[in-house]
Amino acid sequence: ITGLSTRRRIEKGIGHIPEEYMIGVVPDFSVADNLVLDKYFEEPFAHRWGLDHKAVERFAREMIPQYNIRTPSKDTPAIHLSGGNLQKLILAREISHHPRLLIANLPTHGLDVGAAEFIQNQLLALKLEKCAILLISEDLDEIMSVSDRIAVLYEGRITGMVPAADAVKDRLGAWMAGVKL
């Protein structure tokens, strides 16, 4: 997938939540424009002369409350949002494509408890919709609550793999430190 353009990845049903939320947005663009960054070529947003701004506005009005994005306005530049609200914005944009695979790299890292819980609940809901989720996380509680199967990497190698139902924190921690059990 590394050789594919962003547009081709979307067309193939792949979504991505980056490790750093500022990488996932254009800081000076509005919340509304960031929600449709990857939809400019799709109906109803594509317009003969650019974006259909009314369609963008309708979409933003729907997504902002649905994903609990706390913003003064849809026109607020993304740079003025908290990390948790930026992450919810990115999640809303990525989920709106109904991906078959979502790569979530540290999706709750550095977020407050409320925002982290919201993100985890959205991932669980997405999982129920039969979306495969590749969760990359250092939070054992998050890993154990969201995952069906857990693989631990250490220095680029899998040191252990276990169904989440059989996972034990001590064993996972040992694998994370490179200990082979």
Each PLM stretch: what is its role?
Residues I1-L181:
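Glycine-rich phosphate-binding loops of nucleotide-dependent enzymes
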